[in-house]
Amino acid sequence: MRIFKIVVLTKRSLILLITIFIFLLFISISLFIKINLLPANTFADPRSGIIVIDPGHGGVDGGTNKDGILEKEINLDVGRKLRLFLEQKGYKVIMTRDEDISLEALDNSAKSRHQRDLNARVNIINNSNAQLFVSIHVNCNLKKPSTDGAIVFYNNKYEQNKSLAYSIQKALNNIVVNNRKRTVHNPVQAKYFVLGNADIPGVIVETAFISNKSEREELVKGTFRENTATAIVSGIEQYLHESTNVSSPGQ
């Protein structure tokens, strides 16, 4: 014969158990949010279509250069073309700079001019309520001038960074120079300041190697810059389609 014990909870015990349950539930939810979710301003409306373009360098900072060709000028022109193509598709674009200037005057929190410039770019990105950002740069490898191709850099701070990097890299790898494809690269994980301090997904795109003679000749051509901007747009839209399943604003 089985004997069943009946446990009778007092009102005080019941309240205590409910309190403990609610506390544990709260802790679990808090940990889930902390581990899996991005900062609040990352969750911009996926249909808002805001994208930040960050043309690197500018003003007193010319960036890398070769044979009188300045990186800062290429970055700005590619950035403007990228803005045009994105706006034609219905996106709203915010530029960190739209002229030949550096941005250190917008920040006074550091002694170094270079650091103030970087801080200003991060502040613009983080206050944009954008879905993502793309920083435009030009690469250089004087020790191995034969190196060519576009390379996309990302930080592993957010999982979305890697997805965005791979989408843009895939599109850039298809650009043809002088009737041949350039070296196919994979995205590279990096700890650049802008990537590590941005509160939204983003990448740095090194469009080509100014140290490579063939690519240097292409970098000054409007067609190459347009093809680069077009490829970046394609990568952005592929990323947005895969991550949010939302059509571009113009569709």
Language model features by range: what are they?
Residues 1-251:
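Catalytic-site microenvironment of enzymes
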